[in-house]
Amino acid sequence: QEHRIDLALVEGNTRQPNLKYTPFLQDELVAIVHTHSKWMDYDEITLDELKEVPLVLRERGSGTLDVLITALHKHNIKLSDLTIRMHLGSTESIKLFLENSECMGILSIRSINKELYSGKFKVLDIKDLVMFREFDFVQLQGQDTGLPALFMQFANHYKEKL
């Protein structure tokens, strides 16, 4: 409300009437394991198997964890039903942790492209669990010109490389 930020990139479904939301990017969360993990031999696990797998997840309040909670809720599964070994505060810390553990992580597919390409991690499908989220540009209503508009054009042009 103090007009200090011309443009923001946000995740989530919260909407305020004085702000303009422009869809930018869809992201998928996936289950990953290190290729030295015993879970490497699996291509897909069930929701019941997910309850038994040791997990390392993002911290409470993170958008990533919120998307997981929402997806699990659709199947009447709570976080407390899972075998959570640890909550960590960043994507990079989860990736480092997974390199030396038998745990599974839930992260954005976009955050692990390099590791998938190098063969460090493998994506495991979780049968019937869909985890997508949207990112939107946000700006004050009527403030859709100038440098913010130019940046949005630039970002939209190059978003497939993200």
List each language-model region with its residue ranges.
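Secondary-structure junction motif
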Residues: 55-76, 145-146, 162
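Short beta-strand-centered segments that line the small-molecule binding cleft or hinge
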Residues: 1-29, 33
